[in-house]
Amino acid sequence: MAAAAIGEANLAQFGRAQRVIPGGVNSPVRAFRSVGGTPRFMVFANGPYIVDAEGREYVDLVASWGPAILGHAHPAVVSAVQEAAARGLSFGASTPAETELAEAVIARVPFVEKLRLVSTGTEATMTAIRLARGFTGRPLLIKFAGHYHGHSDSLLAEAGSGLATLSLPGSAGVTEATAAQTLVLPYNDLGAVRAVFEANGPDIAAVIAEAAAANMGVVPPDEGFNAALTDLAHEYGALLILDEVLTGFRVSEAGFWGLDRGYTPDLVAFGKVIGGGMPLAAVGGRAELMDILAPAGPVYQAGTLSGNPVAVAAGLATLAHAGEAVYDRLDIVAGTLSAAVSDALTAEGVAHSVQRAGNLFSFVFGDVAAAPRTFAEVQRQEAFRYRAFFHAMLDAGVSLPPSVFEAWFVTAAHDDAAVGRVLEALPAAARAAASACPGRPLLFVRR
């Protein structure tokens, strides 16, 4: 059933939520601030579809922001969760399934020798950074503008005015002293990285980078960038932390690293797919590093719900069913949809570029660059065209990410019927994008 204008149920739910939840949402991007309008409140999902409080069904291209690679409510995952829940929701003790999941990850990603389970991607990256600082005894961290690694204080930093300038707080509540320990550099710029290492090398503990940027839209690394980044970090005695929270086990059985081999990260953060839609994440790496985590070593990390048995069951079931056929289907659907959107926009004269990293894709609207490589280039786009495109698709029954800075996510459950519904909606949405006019300034909202 195609969507129509926003209904009373969604409006009522949003109003009710705003009275008791800050902004009416529990993660900012859900509020539709980047695209305008009233957010949909979802009540049911199955396969490639999701249903809102009005009972309207949408083809879902958000997929819970990535975890649902098999589709919503996959029978094997649901069954595994039900069986685990029947045995107990949480024990506060170790379980055999934790070891099974660690073994499954290590089998897929050979540079991971040991794995620690946590509950969120933020915890995973935060722990990786603490490990790097504990191992090297150094305070500083390099990250890239536009890369998102969760909401821990040291990662909510923005670039200062100069190349080697210590960074500024990126959120109220983050102290200048904390932000000053993070050096924010332009992505895909090895020269900038080398310059900062030359100036601050003895104090830099690690470089943290998304394996492929997917939180400023999709911006893949330049060919050889991740390998060169690793070599450069090691040259100065620093570590490379690869953030695969979003890409891990989504773009291949070994994450984006599986598509971009030729280097060995020191630490890696996983999330989303590893939990199959449940709150679960992990940090992994070589044993020499992982063994300084408590209780084996002096770097502290703990969590009451770390390795929650229900979440672990969902993750194990998801990984068990995410084989070659699933990734082949994801690639086919991503290729079909990204090409179709591009064709529709081209037909209406809308300048754009298609951005892909494996089966992740997004679009940059406007004549920005043939293939934007940095956050600064991505920010120059005509986001007002995406707002119009987004709402036209939503009205036609297709749920897209409510921000031009987010990747589109497909699932193995997106069959020809679901893909066909998306294709049918594209011409009108492209016309809406073509006729859109600039409005309020571009708003960048992290999820």
Swiss-Prot record:
Gene3D superfamilies, per database record: Aspartate Aminotransferase, domain 1, Type I PLP-dependent aspartate aminotransferase-like (Major domain)
Modification N6-(pyridoxal phosphate)lysine, positions: K272
The keyword NAD belongs to this UniProt entry's keyword annotation: no
Enzyme Commission number, as recorded: 5.4.3.8
GO cellular component, one term: cytoplasm
A molecular-function term among this protein's GO annotations: pyridoxal phosphate binding
Primary location group: cytoplasm
Keywords: Cytoplasm, Isomerase, Porphyrin biosynthesis, Pyridoxal phosphate
Enzyme class of the recorded protein, top EC level: isomerase
Names of required cofactors: pyridoxal 5'-phosphate
Pathway entry: Porphyrin-containing compound metabolism; protoporphyrin-IX biosynthesis; 5-aminolevulinate from L-glutamyl-tRNA(Glu): step 2/2
Catalytic reaction annotation: (S)-4-amino-5-oxopentanoate = 5-aminolevulinate
Similarity field: Belongs to the class-III pyridoxal-phosphate-dependent aminotransferase family. HemL subfamily.
PANTHER family linked to this entry: GLUTAMATE-1-SEMIALDEHYDE 2,1-AMINOMUTASE, GLUTAMATE-1-SEMIALDEHYDE 2,1-AMINOMUTASE 1, CHLOROPLASTIC-RELATED
Assembly description: Homodimer.
Name the UniProt record assigns to this protein: Glutamate-1-semialdehyde 2,1-aminomutase
Organism whose genome encodes this protein: Leifsonia xyli subsp. xyli (strain CTCB07)
Gene name of the record: hemL
